[in-house]
Amino acid sequence: MTEQTIDNILPASKNNVKQWYVVHTASGAEKRIKEDILRKIAKQKMTDFFEDILIPVFGVSEVKRGKNVKVEKKLMPSYILIKMNMTDKSWHLVKNIPGVTGFLGSKIVPKALTESEIQNIFNNLEAEAKVAKNSKLYEVGEIVTVTDGPFETFMGTVEAIDKARNRLKVSVSIFGKATPIELNFNQVKKSD
């Protein structure tokens, strides 16, 4: 019976094929673990086995202490993505970093992400960044001007913000009566 090693199980490891893998980490330790992996790769001269290490984050503007500051939010807290050639040696390099709890997949064989899965992660990251950027543009009670649709040029007051759907509930005056309408973020602009 042959030994159950990654080199024996995964044919890709012999062809130097790099694929994306998900690594589970200790909470809040993603940056330190990424730096530790990069240091260990350089120290062990294994740069040929690794192509990229990503922490899926997006920038968000928040008000802290009365100032608008940019902070990073994690799309997948406690996870990092590594594009690597999975061999016994590269697996052990990552697995033995303090704070790494394991790869996604079985304990013996990590599961590589498919192209559609990795594309989905990148699309979600892009969408979250867009939502975060746009949702901070408007505040409840703010006066906005409708720029698109049947109520174009109407002015209204933001009543609610739905970040998940990229929509605002805006109260506009129609025939002297306040009427709530739902609009996309890109259908309004801040009034001067």
UniProtKB/Swiss-Prot annotation:
UniProt record, GO biological process: DNA-templated transcription termination; regulation of DNA-templated transcription elongation; transcription antitermination; transcription elongation-coupled chromatin remodeling
Q: Does the keyword Transcription apply?
A: yes
A GO cellular component annotation here is: cytosol
Keywords, in A-Z order: Transcription, Transcription antitermination, Transcription regulation, Transcription termination
- What Pfam families does the entry give? KOW (PF00467), NusG (PF02357)
Quote the SUPFAM superfamilies the UniProt record gives: N-utilization substance G protein NusG, N-terminal domain, Translation proteins SH3-like domain
Q: Which PROSITE patterns match?
A: NUSG (PS01014)
The family note in this entry says: Belongs to the NusG family.
Q: Which NCBIfam families match?
A: nusG
Report the protein's function. Participates in transcription elongation, termination and antitermination.
The name this protein carries in UniProt is Transcription termination/antitermination protein NusG
